[in-house]
């Protein structure tokens, strides 16, 4: 039955497509970072520190999204007994933890000029710290 899907052709197509998509992704990231961090004008109130938000907010969204994926994959594993879902969830944890750490660091860098201190025990900051602890516990 596997011969019906022509795995050699599909794998060669994926290899070529993967290379093209990597080149497109890297070029889009470079153009986006240049536009966000260099050509973006300073904010009237926050000045140049607003540029940190172009990295901080997406990394927070990705960290929370990865955690949501881990939760959904883990629940689906318990219900449907699909054997690849725990592997996908386990491989998503380091990615989410890196983005969570980037979110905490960039949030602290933004907080220093804005609030005058690197860390405030705000609910959002504390929840990202707890999320990082959850990630590290899940990885361990």
Where are these regions (language model features)?
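Hydrophobic cores of alpha-helical transmembrane segments in multi-pass integral membrane proteins
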Residues: 2-9, 15-41, 47-48, 53-115, ...
């Amino acid at each position: 039955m596997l011969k019906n899907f022509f795995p050699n052709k599909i794998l060669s197509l994926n290899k070529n497509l993967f290379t093209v998509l990597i080149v497109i992704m890297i070029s889009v990231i470079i153009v986006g970072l240049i536009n966000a961090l260099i050509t973006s004008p300073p904010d009237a109130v926050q000045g140049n520190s607003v540029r940190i938000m172009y990295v901080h907010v997406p990394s927070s969204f990705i960290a929370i999204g990865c955690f949501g994926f881990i939760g959904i994959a883990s629940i689906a594993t318990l219900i449907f007994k699909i054997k690849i879902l725990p592997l996908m969830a386990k491989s998503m944890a380091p990615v989410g933890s890196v983005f969570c750490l980037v979110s905490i660091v960039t949030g602290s860098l933004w907080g220093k000029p804005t609030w005058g201190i690197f860390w405030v025990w705000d609910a959002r900051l504390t929840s990202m710290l707890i999320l990082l602890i959850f990630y590290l516990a899940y990885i361990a």
